[in-house]
Amino acid sequence: MFDSTLNPLWQRYILAVQEEVKPALGCTEPISLALAAAVAAAELEGPVERVEAWVSPNLMKNGLGVTVPGTGMVGLPIAAALGALGGNANAGLEVLKDATAQAIADAKALLAAGKVSVKIQEPCNEILFSRAKVWNGEKWACVTIVGGHTNIVHIETHNSVVFTQQACVAEGEQESPLTVLSRTTLAEILKFVNEVPFAAIRFILDSAKLNCALSQEGLSGKWGLHIGATLEKQCERGLLAKDLSSSIVIRTSAASDARMGGATLPAMSNSGSGNQGITATMPVVVVAEHFGADDERLARALMLSHLSAIYIHNQLPRLSALCAATTAAMGAAAGMAWLVDGRYETISMAISSMIGDVSGMICDGASNSCAMKVSTSASAAWKAVLMALDDTAVTGNEGIVAHDVEQSIANLCALASHSMQQTDRQIIEIMASKAR
């Protein structure tokens, strides 16, 4: 996987990125439920006749308004049904990649027959929780995912417990590669990016390949709010400048348009989110192309962006009231700043300005409008880089921004982890009242 002679800390960084930067087809909250249903169906004796599911309030929030790839339908019920009838139980976040037209038709028929139910799990102390129970007559199989979008903790059928994660942990499971991030700094991450052998991080170029393809699909104008395609038209009409800033926003938002609109192309995700992966990737790719960067420079910039985004998000709940496109864009700001001048001071100033700019953006569930927030975050990231290049940034005398970038990040994450919990409850209450 990598050179065993590498610095052990660098090995952990690479493992963390490989753990958190993965292909994902469809918005990852509905996909998490689809995966639970697919794994349950694989354990069931006989074809699935009925699906019951329970999810955490946060997962419900992120599943109410997003299109499930290939179906033209929004919401968790179609995700659960298609996972059960057409999902690949071994494909992780790409669980629906092999779903056939017949499976989609069967899933819609199951919904129409009233054989699929999705409810909020009560009580639920988990931020990310999905459980799917599939039935064939009196026989059933049930799968529970907790904590991470693919983190299966329990598999049970009508006659036995097939798997429970607690048993594995008791036998001595290895420490998560993300643990190292709680003991590191942005300065150490930058040193890694500057010095690690290119061969060890070449794999990160796959994020550019996948997300550029998604962006190109989004520019067709068929998906979501077609923000990218619309802004591109306005450039042609002379209402928007054809410049680097516009290109960053257009190509980044186009990928999110396709992602949230249900395109059947995978995104390279970051921290369990396709939009975070898009936001950490596309601005860096556009700037790299502008400067004619070769594959090695692009890989280093992408590694800095993705690892910085993971580093920041690791201090947050997996799902929260804070729109995490903003924190992914902080990673993008780091990657873009590195491409332009590479100095730690520029990178840290850009991140500080981002925290002073878009830190209040809420997450009100996954939907087509996520592409609006992605475009805003990408634009803010480039603005922060331009300011930093002129030695200008939001200072430690202002708001939640501190004199030290590490403390600024900690302040933002404390806000999201604690004070914004009530915000999250209010958002979920508002969305639930609309659904009734």
Curated annotation (Swiss-Prot):
Gene for this chain: yhaM
GO molecular function: L-cysteine desulfhydrase activity
Protein name (record): UPF0597 protein YhaM
GO biological process: L-cysteine catabolic process to pyruvate
Family recorded in the similarity comment: Belongs to the UPF0597 family.
UniProt xrefs under PANTHER family: UPF0597 PROTEIN YHAM
